């Protein structure tokens, strides 16, 4: 079993991506762990982040997490997410953040300066200074938000990564609901 696990881990760590991801974070969604095949390595994202995938598959399947990671909708709140988007500079970040909030695709966008992203692009390891947008919005707005980012972003492959909000201040989450479109 140890050699089988070692072989699988080596395959995952040594695998190449089928497309480059530009950005600060490469996140494995717990919702897609069960879809990973044990016989083939994950084909996108940060391959080095997936050394524990075989261990997580048995303990943390999407069925085990599906009820616990989704925030329950109440009369005052809706299922909500945090979305990470990287931008090349402050000007691009402000422009994109303003358009997202103006279109009511998000209640709030934080602009975090001074991040360093290391990634592979066109066969070469690159390193760039970027800024990170932390976007708080409704789960139901992920698709239109992603379309908006893709249409208004300078990158060929902009990073758009969503994480569920599993809880928080009821007043803040109510404000998030009321500040975004239905």
Swiss-Prot record:
- What's the chief localization of this chain? plastid
Q: Name one GO biological process term.
A: response to metal ion
- Could you tell me the keywords of this UniProt record? Chloroplast, Copper, Metal-binding, Plastid, Transit peptide
Highest taxon of the lineage? Eukaryota
A GO CC term attached to the entry:
chloroplast
Q: Which SUPFAM superfamilies match?
A: GlnB-like (SSF54913)
Q: What does the tissue specificity note say?
A: Expressed in flowers, leaves, stems and roots.
Q: Where in the cell is it found?
A: Plastid, Chloroplast intermembrane space
Does Cytoplasm count among this protein's keywords? Answer: no
Q: Does the keyword Chloroplast apply?
A: yes
Pfam families xref list: CutA1
Transit peptide per record: 1-70
Protein's job: Involved in metal homeostasis. Specifically binds Cu(2+). The truncated isoform has less specificity in metal binding.
Q: What is known of its domains?
A: A central prokaryotic signal-sequence-like domain may be used to export the protein to the chloroplast envelope after import into the stroma.
PANTHER family xref list: DIVALENT CATION TOLERANCE CUTA-RELATED (PTHR23419), FI09726P (PTHR23419:SF8)
What is the protein's quaternary organization?
Homotetramer.
Further information in the entry reads: Knockout lines indicate that CUTA is not essential for copper tolerance or accumulation.
What the record says about family reads: Belongs to the CutA family.
The name under which this protein is listed is Protein CutA, chloroplastic
Give the species.
Arabidopsis thaliana
Primary gene name: CUTA
